[in-house]
């Protein structure tokens, strides 16, 4: 529990009022309470508002040690700035939705340096390097947002499953995802060469095991791909990786 590890005993959340934000806030509150922390408030907000002053007053009542920004940058930009301008002296914690260098620049790195966040993590593997190099060659920059690598893997897996099935309908793709993503089979990776190899092996009737840019793509019994959680930090106005935490379903 990162919040307790950082010494926070009281917390409030500001979360975007949809399934994503609600789920994050509820799961954080449950884990924080189980670790001995006190949740002072869980405050929903709509995505597009000129001000979040009313919601912020509720979230900061009782002066929590930490305010969790469980939103998207366009909203968090506003309410974090309002919190700082209003004199809030506590800390902030971020999620994948607020892992944004644009947010850091808009709010001001001087206010956010030293703060932490979490995101589903991808270790630095050869597969990730191949993907990043290909992305940069095509777009002139490294992937700017979280989950671009995993979105890429999802598209590749659907294509490989369709090839394995010999059909491109939803049911056939679904039923062949594990056949191309999970062991056993020859390991194949992302990139033009990796995908060509995978397609050739499938055409020859061989089993494959796609290991993606976002890490292992093995589906568990519930159809989930479980990845490590990456803890990141804002240092000198930049977002830097700190460490990975293994998740046990």
Would you name each region that the model predicts?
Residues 1-249:
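Extracytosolic ligand-binding ectodomains
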